[in-house]
């Protein structure tokens, strides 16, 4: 009677491992091993010259309300202290 649960567990493990190991996806145009034919790649991907600028110029966004560096430092210090107080509680 003790052998039945062992064989049932072994059967389930083999069943699930076979399902996981049979998970290779075959796409159209793929050869076994995941290698594509180089001629078909050239046909699929045509180079598009200069459609998108590589490094667009960034706009500078400025705040309409000037803040002093002291206020920014004070805010950062207060946030840090609040975080330390939460850790202690």
From Swiss-Prot:
GO CC entries: extracellular space
An MF annotation (GO) of this entry: gonadotropin hormone-releasing hormone activity
Modified residues (Pyrrolidone carboxylic acid): 24
Localisation per UniProt entry: Secreted
Tissue specificity field: Expressed in the forebrain from larval stages.
InterPro entries: GnRH, Gonadoliberin, Gonadoliberin_I_precursor
Keyword Acyltransferase: no
Signal peptide interval: 1-23
Keyword vocabulary terms for this entry: Amidation, Cleavage on pair of basic residues, Hormone, Pyrrolidone carboxylic acid, Secreted, Signal
Disulfide bridge partners, by residue number: none
Keyword DNA repair: no
Source organism, top-level taxon: Eukaryota
PANTHER family (UniProt xref): GONADOLIBERIN, PROGONADOLIBERIN-1
Function noted in UniProt: Stimulates the secretion of gonadotropins.
Protein's name in the database: Progonadoliberin-1
Species of origin: Xenopus laevis
């Amino acid at each position: 009677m003790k052998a039945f649960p062992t064989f049932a567990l072994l059967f389930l493990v083999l069943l699930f491992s076979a399902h996981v190991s049979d998970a290779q996806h075959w796409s159209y145009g793929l050869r076994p091993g995941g290698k594509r034919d180089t001629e078909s790649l050239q046909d699929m991907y045509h180079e598009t010259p200069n459609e998108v600028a590589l490094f667009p110029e960034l706009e500078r966004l400025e705040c309409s309300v000037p803040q002093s560096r002291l206020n920014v430092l004070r805010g950062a210090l207060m946030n840090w202290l609040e975080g330390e107080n939460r850790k202690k509680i």
